[in-house]
């Protein structure tokens, strides 16, 4: 496994960085060497598994006969949140099951050593300290003193802020500005409540995106593809033809919630001719994806079928079975071919599926496993779609979504495009291309997928980010993260339950250690250069590198994990380098969610630049520019791609917190002046990104938003 480290600069080389570093070292973060012997690290799902004796159904009907006609009697309605509203303020620490270790030493040390066998470490080693000694000589950037003037932000009303923007445009897009999970739902809800906003649409991506919404009665609904406006009376909701849908999962996990709640959706939800995610797409995802690299929702395989024009769309299910059979048979060649190449039997696939579900989290549904067992797989699918979709009286109405959205705008109505994932997770962004989703989830991708006339209709983008605790889930580079993106998965930590009990559970102590010891010259402007020192945090369970401690503590304290899977997201500092490009491409408006978290921080960190440092001294050529050790990448410079970003370290500006003047909705007096720390944070973000901050989130409720006067 390659060393994945962070930091960089586009043009100016800093003379203050030493090159005298041993290979495979990194400042302030755990190393990522090749897995040690006996490692738990499962690099991919590719390896063939031994043959085992499994009972495989000879008839496809055997499974179907056991099922209810249109829904299973027991349906899990809560799914993993890929883009959930981030929790706010103080969160009760998640219950974490103890980690069982074989070592006989003290409980904390034995637990830690059992996990570090993967090659990563919880503690700081000597090589990390050596690297920090080189980077600490970096001359402080003048930008660390910016902005020279802190703006004063005045609160205004929803009507004088957001509603004015809505009324000046025809198409409103709410888009993620980082790597998903930014808390877009609250902004979507605010826009959807505008009386002129009659249409809410999801126009691309699939069930790998998600959001939680609540109705007036406080009932919780977890949606993936279903638009948020379904709970608002008088709103029409659409799922466009560029979306990809597993219709069985859609009915069992999303529509069933509406049925059980007695919500009539028949005249308010319409589905276009979507591409169909089949069970073999999900199995291809399982068999071909590295650990932690996929949601196992079949996204890459189904988009491959779409591009190759081999898959099926919803209309195929509602027409003759013979055409459906032929298309399924042709498209399934990829799946059957992979089994042959990997020398896998159906029983092997079933075993892998059950292993994925062995911790109690259903990542592979029963009907997908039943497909893997079926002898006649094509006939299994034809019957599945006939019973669960075509003949299902609960399946929503279908329509030409593009036509309906166009007609609505011509009538003077407003259309809200609900963006899945985010700008940097878009497959159209080459910088993170290998670790993105498979759709273009930028604002440009949303508008293109909607097929609304961009020359005729006025559109606006509301970008959403969160702070503190910006996060990314899955693999890939993320310079401002506290640990590498594969840190948890490399140690076989699929959920927060896999962490030792009470590990870094005292968030207050962890963050205090970070800002007190991790930035030793934070109060000395002449010496503070923004490089985080590899100090350690200790508790009763052991000793931890401060980056590791913050990653664990943030995930637990802020609830940064999947709602059901508990898969931890990797948190870090707000990244102005990446945010600058987002606002330069998608427009100036930015809303920051969950800012009330800052009520519990001594200081808040903001990444204003990267320093490139490859411990092996290697240079990286990106778009014709060669990055070398000591180069600085500032906000506004071209963002390099992942081969360079893996060796980029954040340069962090620290801002004093506002503990004595909390902004959480439950504690703040309405229209009270914002604390200086909040104003300095917002001023810093605006200065380095050229954005206009429209609002900040300050609580869990839908109306816990502070709108700022422009």
Swiss-Prot record:
It catalyses: IMP + L-aspartate + GTP = N(6)-(1,2-dicarboxyethyl)-AMP + GDP + phosphate + 2 H(+). GO terms for biological process: 'de novo' AMP biosynthetic process; IMP metabolic process. GO terms for cellular component: cytoplasm. IMP binds at residues 181-184, 208-211, 295, 309, 421, 437, 567. Its cofactor is Mg(2+). Homodimer. This is Adenylosuccinate synthetase.
């Amino acid at each position: 496994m390659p060393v994945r480290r962070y930091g960089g600069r586009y043009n100016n080389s800093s003379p203050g960085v030493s090159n005298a570093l041993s290979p495979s070292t990194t400042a302030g973060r755990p190393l990522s060497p090749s897995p040690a012997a006996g490692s738990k690290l499962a690099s991919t799902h590719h390896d063939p598994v031994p043959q085992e004796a499994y009972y495989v159904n000879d008839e496809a009907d055997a499974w179907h006969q056991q099922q209810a006609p249109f829904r299973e009697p027991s349906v899990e309605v809560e799914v993993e949140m890929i883009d959930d509203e981030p929790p706010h303020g103080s969160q009760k620490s998640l219950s974490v099951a103890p980690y069982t270790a074989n070592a006989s030493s003290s409980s904390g040390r034995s637990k830690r050593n059992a996990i570090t066998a993967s090659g990563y470490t919880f503690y700081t080693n000597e090589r990390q300290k050596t690297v920090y000694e080189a980077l600490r000589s970096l001359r402080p950037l003048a930008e660390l003193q910016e902005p020279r003037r802190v703006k004063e932000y005045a609160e205004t009303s929803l009507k004088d802020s957001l509603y004015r923007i809505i009324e000046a445009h025809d198409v409103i897009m709410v888009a993620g500005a980082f790597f998903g999970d930014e808390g877009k739902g609250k902004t979507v809800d605010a826009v959807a409540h505008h009386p002129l906003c009659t249409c809410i649409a999801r126009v691309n991506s699939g069930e790998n995106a998600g959001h939680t919404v609540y109705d007036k009665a406080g009932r919780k609904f977890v949606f993936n593809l279903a638009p948020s406006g379904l709970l608002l009376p008088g709103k029409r909701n659409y799922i466009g033809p560029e979306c990809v849908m597993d219709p069985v999962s859609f009915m069992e996990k999303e529509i069933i919630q509406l049925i059980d709640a007695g919500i009539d959706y028949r005249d308010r939800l319409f589905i276009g001719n979507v591409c169909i995610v089949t069970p073999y797409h999900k199995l291809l995802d399982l068999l071909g994806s590295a650990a932690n690299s996929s949601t196992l929702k079949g996204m890459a395989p189904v988009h491959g079928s779409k591009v190759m024009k081999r898959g099926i769309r919803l209309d195929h299910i509602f027409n003759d079975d013979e055409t459906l059979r032929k298309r399924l048979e042709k498209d399934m060649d990829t799946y059957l071919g992979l089994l042959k190449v990997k020398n896998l039997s159906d029983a092997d696939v079933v075993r892998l599926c059950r292993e994925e579900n062995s911790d109690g989290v259903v990542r592979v549904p029963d009907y997908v496993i039943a497909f893997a067992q079926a002898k006649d797989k094509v006939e299994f699918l034809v019957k599945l779609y006939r019973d669960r979709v075509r003949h299902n009286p609960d399946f929503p109405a279908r329509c030409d979504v593009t036509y309906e959205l166009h007609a609505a705008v011509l009538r003077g109505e407003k259309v809200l495009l609900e963006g899945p994932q985010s700008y940097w997770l878009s497959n159209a962004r080459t910088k993170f291309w290998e670790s993105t989703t498979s759709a273009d989830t930028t604002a440009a991708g949303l508008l293109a997928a909607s097929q609304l006339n961009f020359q005729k209709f006025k559109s606006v983008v509301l970008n959403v980010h969160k702070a503190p605790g910006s996060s990314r889930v899955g693999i890939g580079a993320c310079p401002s993260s506290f640990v590498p993106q594969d840190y948890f998965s490399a140690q076989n930590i699929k959920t927060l339950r896999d962490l030792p009990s009470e590990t870094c559970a005292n968030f207050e102590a962890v963050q205090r250690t970070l800002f007190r010891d991790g930035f030793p010259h934070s109060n000395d402007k002449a010496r503070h250069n923004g490089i985080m020192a590899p100090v350690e945090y200790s508790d009763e369970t052991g000793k931890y590198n401060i980056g590791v401690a913050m990653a664990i503590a943030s995930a637990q304290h802020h609830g940064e994990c999947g709602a059901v899977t508990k898969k931890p997201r990797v948190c870090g500092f707000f990244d102005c380098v990446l945010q600058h490009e987002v606002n330069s491409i998608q427009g100036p408006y930015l809303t920051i969610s969950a800012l009330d978290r800052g009520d519990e921080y001594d200081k808040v960190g903001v990444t204003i630049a990267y320093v490139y440092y490859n411990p092996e001294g290697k240079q990286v050529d990106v778009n014709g520019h060669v990055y070398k050790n000591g180069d600085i990448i500032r906000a506004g410079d071209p963002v390099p791609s992942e081969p360079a970003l893996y060796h980029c370290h954040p340069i962090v500006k620290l801002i004093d917190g506002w503990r004595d003047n909390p902004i959480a909705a439950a504690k703040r007096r309405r229209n009270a002046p914002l604390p200086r720390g909040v104003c300095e944070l917002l001023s810093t973000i605006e200065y380095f990104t050229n954005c206009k901050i429209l609002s900040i989130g300050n609580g869990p409720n839908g109306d816990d938003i502070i709108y700022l006067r422009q």
